Amino acid sequence: SISNPLLRYSYEDHFIMRLGYSFYHTNKREISPLSKALQQNFYTIRASAETAGNVLYGISKLIGQSKGDEDSYKVFGIRYSQYVKMQADYAFTHNFSDRTSLAMHVGAGVAIPYGNSSVVPFEKRFYAGGANSVRGWGVRTLGPGSFATRNSQNSFIYQCGDIRFDASIEFRSKLFWVIEGAAFVDAGNIWTIRDYADQPGGVFKFNKFYEQLALAYGVGLRMNFTYFLVRLDMGMKAHDPASGQEHW
């Protein structure tokens, strides 16, 4: 339906003029002949923030630009997006020995539309599931919240959100050559900040969000070439927060 903002904003043209900042820090030592000693603990922090549309919105107000039929300002005949998005990730690894280690990760993010936008652009919203999220679900097949899709053809449009949280813990053990085995547990989901009619159960609520955390477990193989890693994981659902589904 053209009246559906999620569906309409996912396909219509929009203009994004953004300003962003990224931060990265790690205490992991560089690999060199002088640093062969095992580093027992190391961590990595990644964070980013971006905002869009503020300069254009200020210009629109300054020149007294009139809003179009969609009650929004446009530039070059195209509606421009206005939002703020922030996210951060923390990863920690403890090496028990040169053959076994425990890796932990936690991440969160939020994206808020305002001013000239009522919905964050589709490509800027968060999604859950897949290799870098809760691995018991495929990409864009989890959430938001307890939302359960009924249309597999268009489900990816609705399975995105404005808030994300994910965490994982993974035990790794070297098997032979560059091959490592892994066992993991993942948790997480996404949510919306507004109660959209086409995403029932998707809005974030402090008294319910912990019940809507999806859980998955699984095993995998790693090919660790030191400078890069090739992964193969098999995840299983442990707790499915989708409404109408058997949760455990």
Please place each PLM-identified region on the residue numbering:
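Acidic, glycine-rich catalytic/binding loops that coordinate metals and/or anionic ligands
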Residues: 12
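Intrinsically disordered, low-complexity linker/loop segments enriched in Gly/Pro
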Residues: 26-28
